[in-house]
Amino acid sequence: MPDCTAAPFISHACFFFLQCTVSPLVERFAFPKNLTRGKRLRVICTVTEGDLPIEVEWWKDGLKIGGSNPASAKFGSQGIQVRRIDEYTSLLAISFLETTHAGNYSCVASNSVASFSRSATLTIRGEFIDLKLEIPRFH
């Protein structure tokens, strides 16, 4: 909106305020290979560009981690935690990996202009159990 000011020797002067807001950009992240049950995991999501305020969220398989609906609230009971480190950084932490933690994780950064997300797939290698079954024979 123009801000017009009158001066004694000038008939009018108009000033325009232009505000440009930069949309967020999220750095690529990846999960380590060869993860197995029982290990710990820490992954950082970093927003490398964008004007504040920026909201950073983690999602798993299309559900927001730490969200208010019952489906996404289950992540806390599964040992998945999200910690905000600063305005541009968020940490995803799992203290004891289970096969149920496997899936597609996304870090989504949003501000008043746009949202930007990066995704990676977490794979948990299963444990091989050699079962020897004896089938009873009936005579």
Briefly describe each language-model feature range:
Residues M1-C4, S11-H139:
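Immunoglobulin-superfamily
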